[in-house]
């Protein structure tokens, strides 16, 4: 069963898509089949899965979440560094929203799915004097790692994650 999701913020389009996907899953469940929904990363972090799961459960079906490796944890592992040390704060932010305000938060920041606003993100990082690492397609064949804002391209793919740390070890 292949399900796709539109890349939009339009709530009406998204809700319609979640409903359609849920109906397809329920149809398979009613046929006595087990259904698994695979997602990149973890299904509880900025994932389409949770919206579909809520509808399926509301219709009286059981659904179990099996955790995955969140993309930002995979990014930290790939970079060979921690997300937060000792008392550092960690913020996980969808970068398609108010990025300037988010980057002013204390501590380290993970910017999820940053491609759509990459030029804005780079501009704000430069203005605020912050440094960052960026990974496109972490763990995938097309993976690319960028050390610093200056290395980052103007355009990136959907699965782009940035790690902004208060103190980046430039030797990493």
Model-derived features with residue positions:
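Short acidic active-site motifs
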Residues: 20-24, 97-101, 120
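Class I S-adenosyl-L-methionine
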Residues: 1-61, 150-152, 160, 165-170
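Short, charged, surface-exposed secondary-structure boundary motifs
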Residues: 8-11, 74-76, 94, 120, ...
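General beta-strand structural signal in soluble alpha/beta enzymes
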Residues: 37-39, 65-68, 134-135
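Class I SAM-dependent methyltransferase SAM-binding "motif I" and its flanking Rossmann-like core
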Residues: 44-105, 153, 170
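A contiguous loop/helix-start segment that scaffolds small-molecule binding in enzyme catalytic cores
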Residues: 103-172
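Short, surface-exposed amphipathic charged segments that create phosphate/polyanion-binding patches used
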Residues: 11-19, 78-81, 104-108, 146-152
């Amino acid at each position: 069963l292949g399900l796709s999701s539109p890349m939009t913020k339009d709530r009406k389009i998204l809700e319609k898509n979640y409903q359609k996907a849920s109906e397809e899953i329920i149809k398979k469940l009613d046929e006595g089949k087990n259904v698994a929904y695979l997602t990149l990363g973890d299904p509880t972090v900025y994932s389409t899965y949770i919206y579909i799961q809520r509808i399926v459960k509301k219709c009286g079906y059981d659904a179990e979440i099996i955790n995955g490796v969140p993309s930002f944890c995979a990014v930290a592992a790939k970079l060979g560094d921690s997300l937060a040390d000792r008392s550092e704060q960690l913020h996980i932010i969808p970068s398609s929203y108010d990025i300037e305000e988010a980057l002013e938060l204390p501590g380290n920041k993970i910017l999820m799915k940053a491609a759509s606003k990459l030029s804005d993100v780079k501009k704000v990082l430069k203005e605020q004097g912050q440094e960052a690492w960026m990974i496109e397609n972490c763990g995938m064949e097309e993976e690319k790692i960028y050390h610093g804002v200056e290395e980052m391209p103007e355009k990136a793919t959907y699965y782009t994650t940035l790690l902004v740390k208060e103190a980046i070890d430039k030797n990493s």
